[in-house]
Every structure is written in C-alpha cells, then in structure tokens.
C-alpha cells in the first residue's frame, strides 16, 4: 500500500510539474506576443515622428510665424495667416462646445442618470464619438454652407464644436460620477440646494478631470482637415472675418502637400511639425493636470 501511495504521489507531482511548465510556457508566449505588438506599434509611431521632425525642422523659422502663405513657386513665405485662422477657429469652437458639453455632462451625471432622455443622449453621444469627422463636415455643409451659399469660418467653428462636444460630455459625466455620493448626501443634509451642491462640491472636486477632457478635445480638433474642407475652406490672405472663407493650418497643409512646388511642400512639413508639437504639448499638459488630481 505504501508503495502504491508513493507511486500515486509521484504521478501527481509529475502531472503538476507538467501543468506548471505549460503555464509558464503560455505566459512566455503571451509576453512575447504582447511585446511584439507593442514594438510594432512603436515602430510606426517613431517612424512617423522621425519623418515629421527631419522633414519639418528645415522649415521652422521666424518667417513661418510672421509671413503669409506665398504664391505658387515662390521662395520664402510662412503660415502666419493659417496659424491665426486655426487659432481663431479652435478658440470659438471651444467657447461654444465646452459649455454645451459641460452642461450636458452635468445633466447626465446629476439630473438624468437613468432617465430615458439620458440614455438617448448617451447613445447619440457614443455615435458622435465614433463618427468620422468627414461625416460631421458634410452635415454642417448641408445645413449651413448650402443654405448660406458660401463657405465661412463660422461653418468651420460649428463643425469643430460638434466634434468637441461629445468628448467634453463623456469626460464631464465620468468625472462627476467619480465624486462620492457621500459628499452629495452631506450637502443635502445641510439643506444645500442641488444647483449649489453641484457648483460648489461636485464640479469643484472634478475640475481637473474636466479640464483634462477639454484639453484632449482641443487636441482632437486641432488637426482636423476633413470638416474644414467642407465648411471654412481656406484662402491665401490674412483674414479674421468668420463670415467668409478663412485660412487654417490643416487645409493649407493638405493643399501645399498635394502641390508640385517644393517651397509649398516644405511649408507643409513645417506645418505638420507645428501641429504635432502643439498636440503633443496639450496631451502632456492634460496628463500632468490629471496626475496632480490623482495625487
């Protein structure tokens, strides 16, 4: 009996060793596949960044920010009018889109929550988050540009705001839901009105996260080209009149990159590098703000 028991124990131990060895082998395979996938993604990202920096650094100069876009096949020039136009479009899109997104997020997190209107709003918001930007551009073209019978900066502002609103809504709702309900209950116990509780407690506690979402939304719309092709278009002149077509970086880069002129192509690469740096800085700033909030 003792011999049989010893054999059974030895067989059991051998079976366990085989299972553990197979588990370790599967773990190694999964780790290798994960590392390979990560390196594959990093390879393309580094390649894109390297190409952008090496080809765009030559065009980075003071003239890029002080001179207007040049005529075809002309040396010199810059992107001053396109930079100013993009800044104006992003500014007004943020001014319009941010309050709408924050107010909608407050309703979803504090008032609606499980109501049918909140569910419908979340569903539509999810569709807008995943919708291609060109669809938004065509929509604004149909309801604004076609009705006005001309392109305009305001049409571009509306298109960019529509792209920004869903991000701000989602971020605001998620950040407000992270605030403990005990804080709300304590405020209600003191007789605080709901609007006062929201403004003084929940919004104050989640302001860093909401600000992070706003910065990420700005980074999202900063490089959008498709909506602006159908709305604000572009021009070669210095203009701040949003009732007319206005120069902007994404469309200018697209036009210059597709041209056969080397001078325009160099300016296009410089514009790409400028947008890349701006988006990178916005993402870093958003992460810093969110990290401070966590600590």
UniProtKB/Swiss-Prot annotation:
Entry function: Part of a binding-protein-dependent transport system for phosphate; probably responsible for the translocation of the substrate across the membrane.
Stated family: Belongs to the binding-protein-dependent transport system permease family. CysTW subfamily.
Statement: the UniProt record of this protein carries the keyword Nucleotidyltransferase: no
Name of this chain's protein: Phosphate transport system permease protein PstA
Molecular function as annotated in GO: phosphate transmembrane transporter activity
NCBIfam families in the record: 3a0107s02c, PRK11268.1
GO BP annotations listed: phosphate ion transmembrane transport
Bilayer topology annotation: Multi-pass membrane protein
Compartments (UniProt record): Cell inner membrane
Keyword flag Transferase: no
Annotated source species: Yersinia pestis
Main localization (coarse): membrane
Keywords (A to Z) from UniProt: Cell inner membrane, Cell membrane, Membrane, Phosphate transport, Transmembrane, Transmembrane helix, Transport
GN (gene name): pstA
Residue ranges of domain ABC transmembrane type-1 in the record: 83-286
Annotated signal peptide: none
An annotated GO cellular component: plasma membrane
């Amino acid at each position: 009996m003792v011999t049989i028991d010893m054999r059974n124990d030895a067989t059991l131990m051998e079976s366990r060793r085989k299972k553990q060895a197979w588990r370790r082998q599967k773990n190694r395979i999964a780790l290798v596949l994960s590392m390979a996938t990560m390196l594959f993604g990093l390879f393309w990202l580094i390649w894109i960044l390297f190409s952008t920096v090496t080809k765009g650094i030559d065009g980075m100069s003071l003239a890029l920010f002080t001179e207007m876009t040049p005529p075809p096949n002309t040396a010199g020039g810059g992107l001053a009018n396109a930079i100013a136009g993009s800044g104006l479009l992003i500014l007004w899109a943020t001014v319009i889109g941010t309050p709408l997104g924050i107010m909608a997020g407050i309703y979803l997190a504090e008032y609606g929550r499980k109501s049918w209107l909140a569910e419908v709003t979340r569903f539509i918001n999810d569709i807008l988050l995943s919708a291609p930007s060109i669809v938004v551009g065509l929509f604004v073209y149909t309801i604004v540009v076609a009705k006005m019978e001309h392109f305009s900066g305001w049409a571009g502002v509306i298109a960019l705001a529509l792209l920004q609103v869903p991000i701000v809504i989602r971020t605001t709702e998620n950040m407000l839901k992270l605030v403990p309900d005990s804080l709300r209950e304590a405020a209600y116990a003191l007789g605080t009105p709901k609007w006062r509780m929201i403004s003084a407690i929940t919004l104050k506690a989640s302001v860093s996260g909401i600000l992070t979402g706003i910065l990420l939304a700005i980074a999202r719309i900063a490089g959008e080209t498709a909506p602006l092709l159908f709305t604000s278009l572009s021009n070669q002149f210095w203009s701040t009149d949003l009732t007319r077509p206005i120069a902007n970086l994404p469309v200018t880069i697209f036009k210059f990159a597709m041209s056969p002129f080397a001078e325009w192509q160099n300016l296009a690469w410089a514009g790409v590098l400028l947008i890349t740096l701006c988006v990178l800085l916005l993402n870093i700033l958003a992460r810093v703000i969110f990290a401070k909030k966590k600590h």
